[in-house]
């Protein structure tokens, strides 16, 4: 359990860094938190986010740029609203990752 808490804290620290108007994928957050295989762990951590004011979990989308249908803090439409308030444009619930993805990546994320 101690490692799980540590993993969650690493994930929250990465998500805190995602700038307004940008998004990151679950896999990107996982890699930046230290393990590119943690994509599902990122989802679990964000679902129980203890501080939505300072940990902007709505800025995390899947690898296709889709918002979460199970967004824990108001549902899919709320996640879309929050992203749009920051200037992120969505088409059919999708974010254009080429335009809005946060550029911070790691060698591990790139698979090198």
PLM-predicted stretches and their roles:
Residues 1-112:
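Nucleic acid-binding interface residues in structured DNA/RNA-binding domains
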């Amino acid at each position: 359990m101690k490692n799980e808490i540590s993993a969650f804290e690493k994930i929250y620290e990465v998500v805190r860094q995602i700038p307004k108007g940008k998004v990151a994928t679950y896999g990107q957050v996982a890699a930046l938190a230290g393990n590119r295989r943690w994509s599902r762990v990122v989802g679990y951590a964000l679902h129980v986010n203890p501080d939505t004011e300072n940990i902007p979990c709505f800025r995390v989308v899947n690898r296709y740029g889709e918002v979460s249908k199970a967004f824990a803090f108001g549902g899919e439409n709320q996640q879309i609203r929050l992203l749009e308030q920051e200037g992120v444009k969505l088409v059919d619930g999708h974010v254009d990752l080429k335009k809005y993805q946060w550029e911070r990546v790691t060698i591990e994320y790139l698979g090198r």
